[in-house]
Amino acid sequence: MGTPVNDKIDKFRNVLHTGQVFSLEETRDFAKWLAGLRDRKAKAMIADRIKRAANGNFGTYRSVQGGVFELKIDHGPGYRVYYFQRGKQLIILLCGGDKRTQQADIAEAKRLKEEIERRGGNETF
């Protein structure tokens, strides 16, 4: 099991969904954030983490509010990837950030999720 970040934040969980495969879609915000990272090792670690999640191995993650989840990547400034799950097999990558911008990133992820749901999710993200 993961450990709590502090007393106010949910515990991180490690989950392996054996045999479960997820489809991934990303928002423009997420793609722009990832493309803007200069740290090549971080990019590789994030890409690997997303690939593992698509194969059912979410590793360390937690619910942050309103159906938005956070993948924690233990590298550099503490990178985070925010996503939500639509149905049983679709993961939508909303945005990314690091520990320093965590609260603003969570608010943005919630806003993006609400926007996608309001539109019905039938448009390009």
PLM feature spans:
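Basic, Lys/Arg-enriched alpha-helical interface segments
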Residues: M1-G78, G87-I91, D98-F125
